[in-house]
Amino acid sequence: MPTPARYLHRAPSDIPYFSSDGETYLAQTPLRDLKKSRPLRVLSEDDFAFWQSYGYVVVKQVIPAASARRLLDFAWEFQGLDPDRPETWYEEREYRSDLDRELHIYGFVEAYHHQLLWDSRQARRVHDAFVDVWDCEELWVTLDRLNLNPPNIKNRDRALIPRTEEGFDIELHWDVDTTLGVLPQRVQGIIALTDTRPELGGFQCCPELFRRFDRWKALQPDDRDPIRPRIDRHEFPVVRPEMEAGDLLIFNGLLAHGVAPNTSESSVRAVQYLSMMPALESAEALRRSRVESWRTLGTPDWNATLLGDATRHESLRYGRADLNELGARLLGLTSWSGADAHDETAPVGEESCAEFV
C-alpha cells in the first residue's frame, strides 16, 4: 500500500483531487457519493447507480473482441508459450526472487508498452468510461501489464505460496488501508481478453460489503486487519462478474476483491490491467518517469511488483508505441491544458500542501 505523504499535488480538474503518488487520492466527496456535474458518456444512469452502490461496473465492448484476441495472442507469444501445447505452460524456469515466482504462479505477463496495450489505453470509449466515474476528463492512464493464467497446477499451483493469517490474500483483499479516518479514493480496472467461465477463476469481489461498509466497519475491533476483510460469506457473498472479451470492469479501491484460481482442465483466463486516475501534471518527477518509461520501453517504477521480463526485456523486442492525441495526454507527454509538457514553463497544474487526517 502507498505510504501517505504530507505534500500533495492537485489534479488540473474542476473537482479538487489531491495525490502524492498518482495511485490514491484525497477528495472532498468520496466517489460513491459523487454528484455528477458532467453528462454520462458511456455509463447509463443505472450503471452509475450500481457503481456507486456496489463498487464496480462492467462496461461492454470498450475494445473490439478482435482486439482482445490480438492481445491474447501477444500474451502467448511474449512468454514463448504455445496455446495448443499445455506442457509449455509449466516448463521449469529460474526465478529472480520469491516475488518473481509468485508473479509467475499468478500469471503476470511482464509487458507494458507494446502497441496493442497502448491501443487499449488510448481508446476513446475506455477514457469515456473513466471520465464517468471520476467526473473529470483530465486523467492519466496506468502503465500496467497483462495477465495470462493457465490452470493453477504444477509449478503454477497456488499451494506453493505459503498462506498467511493476515495482510494480503490473493482471494479477497483491499488495496488501500481501510482503517484510515479519511479513506483514500482509488479506481482500478481490467479488460477481459477471454470470456469468463466459473472454472476459469478470475476477478471476484464482495459488493454487499462495499454497500454496507460503514455499518460493518463500525462493528469491527480497532485492531482489525486493514487490508484483509474477516466476513461471513453467507452474509457478504463473494461474486464473479460475468464478462466477455473486450469488456471493461472498473472497480473502486474500497471494494474487497481478489482473483479465484483457474480450476479448468486446459483453458486460460486473460486480462489487461488498465485504470485511469486524475492527472498530476505538477508532479514533474512522476510525469518524466512515465514519459521516459514509454520512450525507452523501460519497466515502470510506480509499483515494486513490476519487474520486467527476465528472459528478454520488451525494450529488446519491439519499438516505441505510437500515441494519438488522447494517448499523449493520458501518458503526460502533452498537458491537458493543451501545452506541450516538454515546455517547462507550460501551465501544468500546481503543487499543494495538504494533510492526511
Regions found by a protein language model. Give the residues of each.
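Extracellular structured ligand-interaction cores
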Residues: 56, 143, 169, 184-190, ...
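Secondary-structure boundary elements
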Residues: 131-140, 179-183, 192-200, 212
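Active-site rim elements
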Residues: 113-119, 176-178, 227-239, 258-261
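Double-stranded beta-helix
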Residues: 183-186, 196-256
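Non-heme Fe(II)/2-oxoglutarate
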Residues: 3-8, 12-34, 81, 219-221, ...
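Short, solvent-exposed loop/turn segments at secondary-structure junctions
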Residues: 63-66, 147-148, 196-198, 210-211, ...
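Short, structured patches in soluble enzyme cores that scaffold and shape functional sites
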Residues: 145, 150, 174-176, 187, ...
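Non-heme Fe(II)-dependent double-stranded beta-helix
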Residues: 2-53, 60-178
